[in-house]
Amino acid sequence: MMIDGLPTLDDIPYRGKHVLLRVDINAPIVNSTILDTSRFESHIPTIEALEDSKLVLLAHQSRPGKKDFTSLESHASTLSKLLGKRVEYIDEIFSKGVLRRIKEMENGEVILLENVRFYSEEQLNRSAEEHAECHMVRKLSTAFDLFVNDAFSASHRSHASLVGFVPVLPSVVGRLVENEVTALSKPLKGEGRKIFVLGGAKIKDSVKVLKNVLENNIAEKVVLTGVVANYFLMLKGYDIGEVNRKVVEDNKEDVSDEEMINILKKYSDKIILPIDLGIEKDGVRVDIPLEKFDGKYRIMDIGLETVNQLSEIIPKYDYVVLNGPAGVFEDERFSLGTYEILRAATRAGYSVVGGGHIASAARLFGLSDKFSHISTAGGACIRFLSGEKLVALEVIKEYWAKKWGKS
């Protein structure tokens, strides 16, 4: 069934077919051990849905030059364990041997090919039509009947393995993409009162979401925490001190102060900022009202009064979206803000947690299963909530409308 113009597995016959599935199982790796398998788990519904096909997976790990830029051998064994069936790993992407092995596949077999970023043209930022001409797509596409994109968390990138097959193979999205798009659309399009709680250190990301939900009248309130809140407190004229100013400057990128001051003025009744702060003084946590803060200490969390205020407000909303932690939650002295905001959100109507650090926090505090939806994506989720189009999904819509949906 189509969602918002996106064709899914329900729109195409795949039993007995050769299916090329793009997944995102990019994981934190230390000393060749995969530390977090949550992304692997998120693809299992799609892989299981395709169990009557001849299934080949494409994925990436890290990027060139990074320590964890590795082969996908351990990813294949991790997937095998989770699926309870063999996932064969091949250390190449489109050699003659690979193509021969794919042709010989039986229904129900699963193969994982090598890290697509080992291939030099993968990460070029090109259009689908240009990528369709590259070696990998030209060679591999001959062995498949259809392409499925299930890599929601990478779908904001116009890379070869994400967009290149769409012009040449009938293409749909997998269950994970379907779930993400459905769940993230609800707080943007649903009826009811909405509150967005934006924190973390990536000021530019939060500002993008803030602008979308305020300018398009989506959110009734936007709560700011973390480094983002400190930036807005600075704009309001509070002296947050040299050490905190530096953290803001280091994370601000190209956000315009002037534009943000105007937004603060225009939406002053909708933006909620901290009324007190959690700081570290002589090795212990101290909560200090905004008015009394002299900027001498590093801000580590929102303060206790702010926490109490938010714990009361958040559960009253029909929809709550959380993105980014409220403080340095990895240090238990300063985990209070993030923990209590997460807890309050579980009591709201429909609760969505963005990917990245806030999702890690939800897992750390054992709250993951209490939310309506936890996104697997960081950047792609932010872009979606900012109202931006995700290029790899738009290409699938476009080609379905003009080519594959008609055949």
UniProtKB/Swiss-Prot annotation:
Chemical reaction(s) catalysed: (2R)-3-phosphoglycerate + ATP = (2R)-3-phospho-glyceroyl phosphate + ADP
A Pfam family of this chain: PGK
GO cellular component terms attached to this protein's record: cytosol
GO-annotated molecular function: ADP binding; ATP binding; phosphoglycerate kinase activity
EC number: 2.7.2.3
Presence of the UniProt keyword Protein transport in the record: no
The keyword Ligase appears for this protein: no
Parts forming coiled coils: none
SUPFAM superfamilies listed in its UniProt record: Phosphoglycerate kinase (SSF53748)
Family: Belongs to the phosphoglycerate kinase family.
PANTHER family reported in the protein's UniProt record: PHOSPHOGLYCERATE KINASE, PHOSPHOGLYCERATE KINASE 1, CHLOROPLASTIC-RELATED
InterPro entries: Phosphoglycerate_kinase (IPR001576), Phosphoglycerate_kinase_CS (IPR015911), Phosphoglycerate_kinase_N (IPR015824), Phosphoglycerate_kinase_sf (IPR036043)
PROSITE patterns per the UniProt record, alphabetical: PGLYCERATE_KINASE
Chief place of localization: cytoplasm
The entry's keywords: ATP-binding, Cytoplasm, Glycolysis, Kinase, Nucleotide-binding, Transferase
GO biological process, one term: gluconeogenesis
Name of protein: Phosphoglycerate kinase
Subcellular location(s) of the protein: Cytoplasm
UniProt pathway annotation: Carbohydrate degradation; glycolysis; pyruvate from D-glyceraldehyde 3-phosphate: step 2/5
Binding site for substrate: 24-26, 39, 60-63, 117, 157
Organism superkingdom: Archaea
Binding-site positions, ATP: 330, 355-358
